[in-house]
Amino acid sequence: MACKQKGDSGSPSSRFSADWSTYRSLSLFFILVTSVNSVGVMQLVNPIFPGTVICHENKMTVEFPRDLGTKKWHASVVDPFSFELLNCTSILDPEKLTLKAPYETCSRRVLGQHQMAIRLTDNNAASRHKAFMYQISCPVMQTEETHEHAGSTICTKDSMSFTFNIIPGMADENTNPSGGKWMMEVDDAKAQNLTLREALMQGYNFLFDSHRLSVQVSFNATGVTHYMQGNSHLYTVPLKLIHTSPGQKIILTTRVLCMSDPVTCNATHMTLTIPEFPGKLQSVRFENTNFRVSQLHNHGIDKEELNGLRLHFSKSLLKMNSSEKCLLYQFYLASLKLTFAFERDTVSTVVYPECVCEPPVTIVTGDLCTQDGFMDVKVYSHQTKPALNLDTLRVGDSSCQPTFKAPSQGLTLFHIPLNGCGTRLKFKGDTVIYENEIHALWTDLPPSTISRDSEFRMTVKCHYSRDDLLINTNVQSLPPPVASVRPGPLALILQTYPDKSYLRPYGDKEYPVVRYLRQPIYLEVKVLNRADPNIKLVLDDCWATPTMDPASLPQWNIVMDGCEYNLDNYRTTFHPVGSSVTYPTHYQRFDVKTFAFISEAQVLSSLVYFHCTALICNRLSPDSPLCSVTCPVSSRHRRATGSTEEEKMIVSLPGPILLLADSSSLRDGVDSKGHRAAGYVAFKTVVAVAALAGLVAALGLIIYLRKKRTMVLNH
């Protein structure tokens, strides 16, 4: 921040002299009346300094008029008695006609002003006794009485503010019209000049008191530049406030800089993100201590410079505030001052970072409860910031894993049993409430390394009322009488699929399904409308027929006694059922080789119908020999392990399979029969050739004998 004073132009006058006491009296008078005075050692001069004074936070720049050449005049900083200050580290630039002097060694602090005396001496030998002294001053912009962050931008949720310390007596033009006029200039590139009334209409607000001027700037105000990095935003605008009054002009300049929503938190650190912009971080101040950038790592702050700047504050540096909204505590910093080097200026901003604390996600609904005693819950990665790592999720106090994951969709599905995985229950009136928790939390707080994983906790609840079906109950009472057990209805279905992924079966309207001889036929038998995890589907026999009738002939065996039919060269292959279905034991999957329906290079039937018999086994108490059969089954045990016809059920495909053969398929089919078919054809060929040769020989012999007999009779 800087302020600038400019007086009317003029040159020293040599017509008015005074002795030393007169100089002291008049000098004190001008100090109290105006901020710019001038006296001469040998004579008084025009009280208005003929140049411009620019007031900075820690120094003063004096610009001399161009008609005052340095070859004729020499400027130096002196004390009130006109003695040169030896410890003043001022810099005189003879080309630019400027003098720069720091407040600390070249000025005195009087009544809230930095006062400095400048002596101009004529270099002409004939006029060396002529010297003129000007008393100039700048307002104290930062005093010991001001708050900790004086000279910094104060950031709030939707605006930024800056406070100037001004010369006493300056006032708002609306409250004291005769005292002077205020103008504001924004945006260095466009240099828009606004009156205070116009600035109020364009996002600026002003507050005056006797010593300070506060400027509040909304983020969408005219001239504000916006930088963005992810969810973090940075706003900045150069400001210049100009106060013009009779005889003087004061310019207050600063650059306002602020960040919005810069903080993300996890269990180990608070991370402050600063979007990429032309400034460079110089220091960080919190807890009344200032740290240079090179010192941050040694004090628990890690710096990451990639796509902007990120400061990771260890949670050991943060304050904690107990809050009902938070899982543990809410972490925050009372204030944080960041100082940047920005376009040859030093700019500071103050933020008040705190970890946003969201309440845990709680679901209270009966829709989560399933009829078979589970809670089905979906968790999405976008439910936290940063995105939730779904691999870190756990259920309750157990290691129960999700039943389904879709990383591309950011989705995980949990199938939580009501009697396991740490599920708790409680009774409330006529309602029983089941409750569990899905969480992703750190066990140590905080760990020693930086983590970008989010904390997450979701409480899931479901309930059953008195009118609902009670499941998974355990009532200790006298054993009931033995009940009569009768087999209940069993619903099965036989389907075929395009490939071994078994994702979507063919519909009823898609039959007949076309298959070439090179293609296997993928079949599946499954149980319908049963949700008991203790039952198991077991195949008995599977076969193919040329008609819809399962008893029609001929028949081609595919599965015998629950095992592959090993009397055929083209064995059936069983496929395991993975966790993609809820009850894998309710399924049987296998494929059939189409060459099994070829005999001696001819397709036995173009339309083939498939059928299976199956039964349901109790996994806890197998009640049929087929329930524990081990493949392969020896021939002498076949049929002995069978079940009664009442226990088995026949199921057929909804339609036929249409088998088509191309020449290559048929040739491969014939070749795959092996030497048995080839040898048989070769044998038949040899026999036919031998018979034909014998017949030709016999006919030749008969003709020869008849010719010989005819010749004998003629003689």
Swiss-Prot record:
Top-level taxon in the UniProt lineage: Eukaryota
Membrane-side (Extracellular) residue stretches: 39-684
PTM text: Proteolytically cleaved before the transmembrane segment to yield the secreted ectodomain incorporated in the zona pellucida. Proteolytically cleaved in the N-terminal part by the metalloendopeptidase ASTL exocytosed from cortical granules after fertilization, yielding a N-terminal peptide of about 30 kDa which remains covalently attached to the C-terminal peptide via disulfide bond(s). This cleavage may play an important role in the post-fertilization block to polyspermy. Additional proteolytically cleavage of the N-terminal peptide of 30 kDa occurs in one-cell and two-cell embryos.
GO BP, sorted A to Z: binding of sperm to zona pellucida; humoral immune response mediated by circulating immunoglobulin; prevention of polyspermy
Extent of the signal sequence: 1-38
Glycosylation sites per record: N87, N193, N220, N266, N321, T459
Membrane topology: Single-pass type I membrane protein
GO molecular function: acrosin binding; structural constituent of egg coat
Subcellular location: Cell membrane
Cytoplasmic side: 706-715
Major localization class: membrane
Any one GO cellular component localisation term in the record: multivesicular body
Stretches the record annotates as Disordered: 466-488
Record keywords, A-Z: Cell membrane, Cleavage on pair of basic residues, Disulfide bond, Extracellular matrix, Fertilization, Glycoprotein, Membrane, Receptor, Secreted, Signal, Transmembrane, Transmembrane helix
Domain writeup: The ZP domain is involved in the polymerization of the ZP proteins to form the zona pellucida.
Family from the record: Belongs to the ZP domain family. ZPA subfamily.
Physiological role: Component of the zona pellucida, an extracellular matrix surrounding oocytes which mediates sperm binding, induction of the acrosome reaction and prevents post-fertilization polyspermy. The zona pellucida is composed of 3 to 4 glycoproteins, ZP1, ZP2, ZP3, and ZP4. ZP2 may act as a secondary sperm receptor.
Protein name: Zona pellucida sperm-binding protein 2
Native species: Canis lupus familiaris (Dog)
Lineage: Eukaryota, Metazoa, Chordata, Craniata, Vertebrata
